[in-house]
Swiss-Prot record:
It comes from Azorhizobium caulinodans (strain ATCC 43989 / DSM 5975 / JCM 20966 / LMG 6465 / NBRC 14845 / NCIMB 13405 / ORS 571). The keyword Oxidoreductase applies. InterPro entries: GcvPA, GDC-P_N, GDC_P, PyrdxlP-dep_Trfase, PyrdxlP-dep_Trfase_major, PyrdxlP-dep_Trfase_small. It catalyses: N(6)-[(R)-lipoyl]-L-lysyl-[glycine-cleavage complex H protein] + glycine + H(+) = N(6)-[(R)-S(8)-aminomethyldihydrolipoyl]-L-lysyl-[glycine-cleavage complex H protein] + CO2. This is Probable glycine dehydrogenase (decarboxylating) subunit 1. The glycine cleavage system catalyzes the degradation of glycine. The P protein binds the alpha-amino group of glycine through its pyridoxal phosphate cofactor; CO(2) is released and the remaining methylamine moiety is then transferred to the lipoamide cofactor of the H protein. The keyword RNA-binding does not apply. Its EC number is 1.4.4.2. It comes from the Bacteria.
Amino acid sequence: MRYLPLTPEDRTEMLARIGAPSVDALFADIPAAKLDPALADLPAHKTELSVERTLGALSAQNVPAGSVPFFVGAGAYRHHVPATVDHLIQRSEFLTSYTPYQPEIAQGTLQYLFEFQTQVGELTGMEVANASMYDGSTAAAEAVLMAHRVTKRRKAVVAGNVHPHYRETIATLSLYADDAVVALSPVPQGGEDILSAIDGETSCVVVQSPDVFGNIVDLKPIAEKAHAAGALLIAVFTEVVSLGLIEPPGAQGADIVVGEGQSIGNPLTFGGPYVGLFATRQKYVRQMPGRLAGETVDASGKRGFVLTLSTREQHIRREKATSNICTNSGLCALAFTIHLTLLGETGLRKLARLNHANACKLADKLAAVPGVQVLNSAFFNEFTLRVPGKAVDVIEKLAAKGVLGGVPYARLAPKAGLDDLILVAATEINTDEDRAAYAAALKEVLA
């Protein structure tokens, strides 16, 4: 995209039209204390070639994930995406299409959204899923607001082991909705006491499995306690591949299942765009945010697809809308659908088992390093290390040796007081050589 700046003549004409003698006069209403004097000393303009060189030098400082042993996760995971996925989503009818308001000319888009919803419903063990959300964290926040509408209560209990970024998003949306959020303290080893926080005023309980530390959580007793109190259980996940191996949240009693779908079909891409997954029970479908693609028949009796429910503020009155979500993550949802279709049920299960096996091998190697403790007993493809000293320092020293060893929990939650923990993820991408390099580098760093 080219940047075409205004000429001095353009500015003079615009100021004259609105009756302002100068640019300073135009902004005279802004208090001087609020103005940044540094903006007046911006460097002179550069040529396009010069800008390209400057940006190229900056980007050269990045370390491509595929160039080093890579064990970073904590909500965004590096998986292999088949070339077929990118090839298909770049077809112009998919890449440039917008909201399918006219079903007679958008059957392809509506059908893949319908297939996406079907896949999400099967993965989560739920009866209905929407056409995607922005990402996992916003899906979690919308789930809390939905639970408040269903139960007519305003108190949400959020487990301490839910990803800190998800907790922040929930707290932000709940603040403006005038809701109460009871956030528990994190318990890295798992087994946090969620049940005692549930009472007769609770609208929902938000639990993540695998949680941010990698622990697999048994949702059934939490679901029983929540339902006994008249509350809903919201199950959250950040690693959708785990559903190829772990019992679906719906089968464990969850009422709403939300999470991040990035791991299937979508690369890391600097943290977005991603695709939020949202599924629930049929009886709650009219309180579900976003939109729903449904199957019907046309005037000739042929099978067709339409937007069935779109209770969002673009379509109805704002005060009646279930969500303000606008354009959903449609292209990312298509990538998810294509990749999962290529995998199939058997392929997804094999992929999940490979992830788990690689993580177990890595955990065994790292646990053998003196001073290192693996905190998890049951995990999928991510686990937590306790290391001597500050985890941030250890990670930086590992990076200097060419190993991206994970995410210090302190970077996600600086005030949690868990400065010695590292979240480590292993996927199908990692090799035996990668694992050996990590263990050797960690041993040297801690020596």
